[in-house]
Amino acid sequence: MPVTRRRLLLVVPAALALPTLAPAAALRVPPLALQSWRLPNGLQVYALPDAAAATVSVQVWYRVGAKDDPPGRSGFAHLFEHLMYKGTRHMPAETIDRLTEDVGGQNNAFTVDDVTVYHSEVPANHLEPLLWAEAERMAHLEVDQASLDSERHVVVEEYRERVLADPYGRFFEALPALAFDVHPYRRGVIGRIDDLRAATLDDVRAFHRTYYRPDNAALIVAGGFDVADLARWVQRHFGPVEAPGTPIPRVAVVEPPRRRDEARRLAAPHVPLPAVALVWRAPGAAHRDAAALQVASALLAGGHSSRLHAALVRERHLANAVGFGADLRADAGTLAGWAIAAGGVPPARLLGVLAAETLRLAEKPPSAAELAKVRAQLTTAALVERETPAGRAEALGWALVLRGDAHAADRALDELQAVTAADVQRVAREHLLRARRVALTYVQGAPG
């Protein structure tokens, strides 16, 4: 199960270089056809019925992610995601695969800082068995030492492949730690090898007991089903799952303000060309500036016509690749711009131009054409997501996790379309120009 990074540097889809259209009236997007209720044990249920759909998407969103890793156990939430595919008291290992793949469906999972999500898509007439399986692993997961050792090995190899073997793996892994000094967002989702090796079966059982409970989960079902049938099946399978009487631990770290700009240097083996980055701390996804920051990010690096790509790659030939991301999570966020140098370009020069072009957004707001194009990119991406039951369910899930409100998925589209050039300039001044930043230079050398 891959670590899905709806996170740093991937938030704004750089491939969405859509043609500029003539200005048009704001789109009127129908709201999600949502029904919701809560079981007595605390499970939140969200139904998105679609009579025209032949499939259903079943998603369980647990409010536990990498920020909740126990002390000395970085990467544990992601490791646990893998373990959830092992057996339960009444369900052999790989049953989820049989219930999905054997009927032409699919399943997967992902872990990020704020949440762990298990999602499956099957033909609509196979919905109830999948609900039973999700309730079963919520209530009765059983993991033995062999399963823990096997999945730990898988995750360690994933870390080696994604971070150690990739020439720029250490570079991208370092960026969250530059934004935060004390908040657990500074840790990577995959964790550290030593911490993964230290995990025990007692850790597994305690983690499941603490976080994998109905009052810490949202069940989202979208597609072709009758809501009355869904309600009956959910009550049948999830209703008996007991919620512990203990409180759920929550991260309550207050990040101290950054007083000055900083510069860091990181060396790693097998780095073909230097890379540089600028990282700022940012507000969380529920902040009033979130939509304008998304637009600003897309203006800077949302495709080949974006400002950073035009200035650093196409016109000056200083970089082979550039990016900028607004990673706005539940508690706080990061803004990060990066560039990989073209051959012979000194990192210091590249860093200076990256900073100048990024901060130019605070002095030169977007033109009407720039703004219309970027709003079209972002709105189109959101509308494409809503074309499938799984996409609608995921949009709702992110609204719950990041903003605490399922209906925020609809408001987000209106907020994007309402962003003005003045809004973009204002947030660039507040969150980039006037904010403290950390500059990173990444070069070939022995790791420090």
Give residue ranges: language-model regions:
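Non-catalytic beta-strand/loop surface segments
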Residues: 23-66, 90-126, 162-216, 240-287, ...
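Short pre-active-site segment immediately N-terminal to the catalytic Zn-binding motif
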Residues: 66-72
